[in-house]
Amino acid sequence: MEGKEEDVRLGANKFTERQPIGTAAQSQDKDYKEPPPAPLFEPGELSSWSFYRAGIAEFVATFLFLYITILTVMGVVKSSTKCSTVGIQGIAWAFGGMIFALVYCTAGISGGHINPAVTFGLFLARKLSLTRALFYMVMQCLGAICGAGVVKGFQKGLYENNGGGANVVAPGYTKGDGLGAEIVGTFILVYTVFSATDAKRSARDSHVPILAPLPIGFAVFLVHLATIPITGTGINPARSLGAAIIYNKGHAWDDHWI
């Protein structure tokens, strides 16, 4: 067939190489056309089951994310010595690993946001409508609250005595330090999401969509590794809000604005 014809040529390394010719060669040089921006309001979504299914997926994913990660934090905090627990590295792996798994599971349903900051960034880029963005954010926050609530329900004493996984600026750091760490950390995450899910790369390399959860999860791991000692690592407003609401003690709200 014409689109699959190949021409044998001498490559730069002096070995023959096959290059597509004809229509196949032309298709490689075509400029990628960006899809049209999502409409600001899309009332038709409200009558679609896929819209609500996506919201449920975000709720479940954020619920599981908070449940596993806060349990990990509780296990580390209650330990008397660093050698008897997974430490900061283990917490970072729990956050990064859960994001990797949950993005992989929900990408085909909701896009695998699991984070209002990611949803807001994609909305600003006109990748989704305002209706869907608001619905996702509400479901993410509800999922986070429920996830933290289940942890408290299972181990109330341990939860309340060890900070409840709430984000606070650690002693020795200023609020400015915490704000800077959160801004940079959130930027790294959102930048990685945009790069890993870039439609132009996906069209050129078929393996990119499959591998997208890996760099996203790894970025979350690295950001947590760097900023857990500063703020406990927010970078996810739903995660911070859920832990603060369920813990609901003074210091959990003092630095919540960061």
Swiss-Prot record:
Per the UniProt record, which residue ranges are transmembrane?
56-76, 90-110, 134-154, 176-196, 210-230
Ranges per topology, Cytoplasmic: 1-55, 111-133, 197-209
One of this protein's GO BP terms? Answer: response to salt stress
Q: Quick check: keyword Transmembrane in the entry?
A: yes
Q: Which InterPro entries match?
A: Aquaporin-like, Aquaporin_transptr, MIP, MIP_CS
Documented applications: Can be used to improve resistance to abiotic stresses such as cold, drought and salt.
Family annotation (Pfam families): MIP
Q: Which GO terms describe its cellular component?
A: plasma membrane
Q: Which UniProt keywords apply?
A: Cell membrane, Membrane, Stress response, Transmembrane, Transmembrane helix, Transport
Q: How does it sit in the membrane?
A: Multi-pass membrane protein
Give yes or no: UniProt keyword Glycoprotein: no
Picking any one GO molecular function of the record gives:
channel activity
Q: Where is this motif: NPA 1?
A: 115-117
Give positions of region: Disordered.
Answer: 1-37
Q: Per its UniProt record, what PANTHER family does this chain match?
A: AQUAPORIN OR AQUAGLYCEROPORIN RELATED
Family under the similarity heading: Belongs to the MIP/aquaporin (TC 1.A.8) family. PIP (TC 1.A.8.11) subfamily.
The free-text domain note is: Aquaporins contain two tandem repeats each containing three membrane-spanning domains and a pore-forming loop with the signature motif Asn-Pro-Ala (NPA).
Q: What is this protein called?
A: Aquaporin PIP1-2
- Please name the source species: Musa acuminata
Supply the source organism's classification: Eukaryota, Viridiplantae, Streptophyta, Embryophyta, Tracheophyta
